[in-house]
């Protein structure tokens, strides 16, 4: 039997303005996905959003939904001490992790952060963790935007070691996601694991992954988002409530639980 595990393909039109090569690859990916529709016997999609993608591509076989298997023990490794010390300095840290790419909409994160910094907390920092490979023009445009609007402390880490990623998470006070295309969005789960309050724009699979954890935004309004950031960061009771909801959602992604379900699906449909 032929089995497919599907993680999604970024719509090429989202990448086209900044990375034509990546857009072409994604376009080819969609064509190949359609060609495989009648070649596989069973599919696992890591979100309902991804399942619907397969159905749109013409897949008639059985498709089950199972979240990504995440090795949470990796996140308990020691963070990079110098970087943690650098960012754990009393400055409020807003974080987003994910490759620098136009579908991730880091420009909207910077916009909301800039208003938060201007109107609520000048002692704040934005840490954008992720490699910009292929999207250097997009990164440069965002850097110019921050400079023109006098937004201070916007950090593009570039590609960094895993221990340094852990340090960024450990130092973070709030996770802000404005991405417009995610097949699952592992960083949401990572932020929940590190007990960082999450605000995320409700696009693609984002709402599905976040569940009842975190705060979902149904529209992009930078000023309202900045006010919400301030409210969450100042209200310890609200923070505790959000983190409690996130912890509850996190249980659904427990490694043993997902692994057991994966093996069960294979036994039922493949073996």
Regions from the language model: what does each represent?
Residues 37-78:
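Donor nucleotide-sugar binding/catalytic pocket of nucleotide-sugar-dependent glycosyltransferases
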Residues 215-222, 231-236:
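Conserved acidic donor-binding segment of nucleotide-sugar-dependent glycosyltransferases
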């Amino acid at each position: 039997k032929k089995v497919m595990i599907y993680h999604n393909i970024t719509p090429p039109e989202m990448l086209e303005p900044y990375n034509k090569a990546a857009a072409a690859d994604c376009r080819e990916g969609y064509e190949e996905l359609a060609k495989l529709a009648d070649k596989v016997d069973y599919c696992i999609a890591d979100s309902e959003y991804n399942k619907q993608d397969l159905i749109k591509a013409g897949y008639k076989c059985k498709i089950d939904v199972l979240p990504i298997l995440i090795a949470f023990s990796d996140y308990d490794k020691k963070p990079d001490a110098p970087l943690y010390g650098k960012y754990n300095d009393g400055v409020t840290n807003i974080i987003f992790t994910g490759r620098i790419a136009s579908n991730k909409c880091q420009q909207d994160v910077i916009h909301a952060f800039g208003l938060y910094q201007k109107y609520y907390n000048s002692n704040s920092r934005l840490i954008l963790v992720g490699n910009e490979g292929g999207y250097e023009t997009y990164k440069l445009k965002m850097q110019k935007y921050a400079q023109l609007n006098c937004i201070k402390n916007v950090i593009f880490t570039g590609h960094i070691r895993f221990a340094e990623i852990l340090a960024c998470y450990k130092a973070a006070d709030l996770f802000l996601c404005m991405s417009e295309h995610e097949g699952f969005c592992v960083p949401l789960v990572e932020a929940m694991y590190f007990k960082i309050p999450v605000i995320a724009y409700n696009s693609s699979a984002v709402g599905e992954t976040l569940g009842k954890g975190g705060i979902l935004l149904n529209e992009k309004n930078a000023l309202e988002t900045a006010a919400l950031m301030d409210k969450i960061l100042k209200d310890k009771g609200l923070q505790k409530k959000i983190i409690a909801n996130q912890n509850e959602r996190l249980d659904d992604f427990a490694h043993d639980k997902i692994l057991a379900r994966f093996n069960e699906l294979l036994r039922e449909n493949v073996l």
